[in-house]
Structures are given as structure tokens and as C-alpha cells.
Amino acid sequence: MMMRFIKIYRWLFFTACLMISCSSYDFSGVFSTLPAKPQAGEIVTLLYNPKGTVLEGSNQVSAIVRTYADRDLQPVSMFSMPNNVVDTEEYKMKRKQDGWLIEILVPDSVVGLVVTLHNETDTDYDEGLGYWVPLYTSEQHLFPGAEAGYAASLVRRGWGAKLDKTLYADTLLGFYNNEFSRNPAKKADFSFSYFSALKKSKGEDAYLEIEANLEALDNPDQWTEEQLFFLSAWYGAVKNQEKADYFKTKSREKFPSGRWVQREEAGGFYKKVGSTEKKEFLDEFEAKYPDHSGSSYMRGVIIGEYIKEGSYKQAFEYFKSLNDKLWSERPVFFAVNSVKDIENDELRPLLEIINKSVTVSRKEYEDPSIPKPPLKISSTWKETRATQLALALDAYGLVTNAMGNNTEALTYCKEAYQLTNKQHKQVNEHYAAILLKNGSKAAAKEILEESIISGIQTPDMEKILKEIFIGTQGSEEGFTSYYSDLKTKAFGDLKDKIESELVTQRAPSFTLTDTDGKEVSLSDYKGKIVILDFWATWCGPCKASFPAMKKARNKYEKEVKILFVNSKETAKDKLQAVKDLMEENNYPFHVLMDNKNAVFESYGISLLPTKVIIGKDGNIRHRSFGFRGETELLDELDAIISILNS
């Protein structure tokens, strides 16, 4: 209690000093702090002068502050990457004299801050590394872990695509080296992030150094399952497969029912076909591993399978049998999209399932039961919870609509539309379709037009808009021109966005073997636009994008070379797994086998799928991450190719 009183007294005293003696601030630099050497548990004032930055002339500036710890922190799942970020939050700054300021109470548990500043449209990342605010001890010494912690907070997701971790790897490595020269014991606290930076900076030249560090960390008397997984994963990353297999074997011997064994056995669930096979597998699996963390998703998949099969009563019976066991909603919502109109009570069991999701999601939205994720600001976290509730309401509205209750469905879909702030393509489409069913053609048309112009589109939006157009005009004459105008506006905005993201980085050369055994080099396509699509057979979003990529390949076959680079492949027979996927789906793709992940690493790929677009001059011009949908992918490629051809 006394310590709390002292802190409150310090805060009151500090505020009084500001009011009495700090009537002016020094904004001579772009970024500074008061005090110059801040401490944990104290108030720090961030001072920012945007003159000469992208934020010069802003009417409002906000700061995003990322606080970090003095070590890598392991998430609940040992399979997730460690992360030393304690919290991320956004603060609106106050205008003062020639600049902006904000006062922040620094938590006791952190050793530094990283700050970025932004207005409504632009962000000052300080060239990608953020503004660094290390914390100091009461003796005015740099806190142990402050330097390595700063680098680690950037290695872990950085500032999204704005931080090129390959470009800045040497800089980040310098912070680790400074830290370890001052505090050698800290190397063990930052093993994961340090190895990541070392590998990015030195490539294969770092392997021996990483192995030496791994040997120092290997203590059989203190083996935990987490440590064995860490050792195996990193030996694998530096291409020492013998050691990687050794520690994997030791883990299976020491923890025969451990999380690693469970995860591998759980993979068999996704090879089963249909609700019956999947349920039989999960029943046996849960009897063996009752506490497996991934079972909730598998339960959701089973409910979804019943729905896709039209077995709505069985879906409900299985749902009821779960009692208080958790089940994932995503596969259920996905399955609901396949529900056809049945104007009777056959679908009513689905309403009871989805209503449970609506109730839980609304409670989480209004009063979350879990802490805010450390890498999300409060407003973004609230948007995430709002989207979860919106998807539950959207699913409820879809089923209600399929049962013929169009007016009731409109209520749910309208709330979903409002919760997602018009930014979710599926919700927008469904709301417009149900408005149309309720006779509100003008409102449906306005929603679809606004969504398409904003680049938020599903393939079915064009069909619905065409139906409205014909119903209003009496024929489809003129629709093509009308729709083209909408797409032109969206395309212009998309091109502006992509042009602002263009880079010019020399593309690393490579030679790989394709599925026919022929050697293929990047230099074979000199003077041509090349798209490298990094993927793997286990990657769901990669495979989901392939129908769209087939359309892109057919459209640009003569002017653009698309190479599908199979990397991070886990199949025992990699080549056969790739060939089977191509043949089963009739994909005419030119696939290169990156069996040693050398190209994956030389291009600094961190997730799958990633598309790297290389210009005619041999430079990397753009990177596209993940898969958001067919329309978005094709529009993005159209825009990039148009820019590079101009």
C-alpha cells in the first residue's frame, strides 16, 4: 500500500512540475523523451516533431507503443514462436508548440519501448525500425536485456511488411552483439530471436555458430518437451537433419504421450473423409489424449461436415453431446454457406447450434474473458471480437433466410454489417442479397456498389448486382459498361496503394529442378515479369489460391512467367506429393522443387503462401502475403502487372 502511495505521489509531483516549470518543450529533434533516461514503473513523456517526416502538417498524430521484456517469452503452445512483446497500445498525442506529446506510465515488467507514429493515412516507422526507448536502472545504467529485447521485438513480426528483416538483419544483429558483450548470460534468454537474426544476416555462414550455441543449451538432465522441440527445430533449420531427428526421437521416448506426439497423430484426422470417419477418429483420439488442445477445432470440423452433408439433426445431436466442450466456429460458419433454401423446420437444429455461438461471441465482444493479445492494440482487438460476433450473426441470418424468414434474417445480417463497418466481403454480400429478397433493391445496390468500389468483393456480388440491374432496367444491356466503371474506380485505388508499396531489391539468382527433372534458372526469364509463388502441399491457403492462380496463368501466359516454388514441404515423397496434387486438380503449373528451402531462405520468405513479383529488370518489386480470396488476388495481380508494364 505504501509503495502505491509513493507512486501516486511521484505522479502528482511530476504533473505539478510539468504545470509549473515545463511550460515549453524541446522539439529540436524528431523524437525524444522526458526524462532522457526513463525508468520502469515511472512516467515517460514522448516528444515528437513531424517536420521533415511523412507526418509533417498532420492535424492529428497517434503513437503506437510496443513494450518488451528482457527475454523471449514462450507462448502457451510450444509450437508457436517465442515473443518478448509484453503489450502494444495506441495513444492519441496532444499538440504542444511545434510538436506532439503523450505521457505514458511504463510498466514495471518491461525494459524498453518501440514507438511508431501515424495519422489517418501515413505512418512514421523511422525507416522501419521504430523509435527506440530503452529503459535505465536507478543508477542510470542501461537495463539488462534492453538492447537484445529491442531487436527481438522487431524480429517477432516487426512492423508487418514495413520492416524488411533481411535488409535490417545486420543492424538487429548489432544490438544482440552489444547486449551479449555487456551481459553474456542474456544470450540464453534470447536464443530463438537471436538465431533468427543471425540466420537472416549471415545465411548458411551462421549455421556453425548456431550449432555451437545449441550444443551449449543441450543439458540432458534438464530436458523438457519444449527444449527438445526447440533443439530439433533449430538443428533442422541449420540443415543438421541427423541431430534434428535425434532430439525428436528423444522427445518421443521421454514424452510418449506428449504434445509433439499428439500433434503428429492428430494429422490423421484431416485424412479422413466425411463426418463418420472423422468422428470415429476423434472419439478414439480423445480417449487417448483427453487434454489435446486442438480437439476443439476438430469438433467444429465434424459439425461442419454434418452440415455440408445435409445431416442437420446429426449435427445438432453431436453438438448437444459435446456439453461444455469447446468447438471451433470457423468450419461451422464455412459449412453454413453451403446451406440451400428449405422453407420448413428441417434447418431449425442449425439455429440452436449457431445461437450458442452468437451468445458466446456477444459476451466475449462486450466483456472478454481472456487478456488482450500483446501484439494487438485495444481497438484492433475489439474489431477482431466484433468480426467474430458478426460472423455468428451472419450465419444465423443465412439459416433464417434459407428457412424463408427473410425479414428476421435481415435483422441479424444488418447488425453483422454494422459490426464489421462495411469491411467484410462475405457479410456485405449476404446483407445485400437479403435486402434484395426483402424488396430493398436500391439499398442492396448501394451496398454492393460501395463494396466493389472499395475493392471488397466476392464473385457472387457481380451476379446479384446484375439481377438488380436487369430488374430495374428490364434487360442486361448496358450492364457490362456499368460494372466496368465500378471496377475501374476500385482498380485505380488499388494501383495507387500498390505503387506506394513498390520496392527495388535485386532478386537472388537460383537454379532448381522442376517436376520433370529439368533445371530451371531465374536467368532463363531475363527481360520478363516473373511471379514466384511459394507454397507447400500442407498449406491450406496455398491450395485455396490455386484455382485463382490457374486463371492468372491462363490470362498472362504469354507475358508473365509464374513459377510455383514448392518449399517447406513435409511430405515423405515430396515430388510425388506435388505431382499428385497437380494431376488430381488438373493444374498446368510449372512447379520447381525447393527441397532444401534454399530459395525460400534467400528470398526471406516467412510465411506461405507468399508471391514475389520480379520486374523485367530483375528486381523484386512487390510481395503478396496469404490469400484473401479469388477476386482480391486476381485484381492485385492485374494491378501489379499493369504497373510494371507501364
Indicate where each model-derived feature is located.
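A short beta-strand-turn-helix
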Residues: 510-530, 554-555
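Thiol-/selenol-based redox modules, centered on thioredoxin-like
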Residues: 613-646
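Glycan-association/targeting regions that enable binding to alpha-glucans and other polysaccharides
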Residues: 22-215, 227-253, 276-287, 313
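N-proximal helix/coil linker or "cap" segments that precede and/or mark the start of modular domains
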Residues: 437, 445, 449-509, 523-525, ...
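Short, internal strand/loop/helix patches
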Residues: 511-513, 576-617
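Conserved redox-active cysteine motifs that mediate thiol-disulfide chemistry
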Residues: 526-527, 533-551
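Structural microenvironment flanking redox-active thiols in thiol-disulfide oxidoreductases
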Residues: 544-585, 595-601
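Alpha-helical repeat scaffolds
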Residues: 165-180, 204-219, 241-254, 275-289, ...
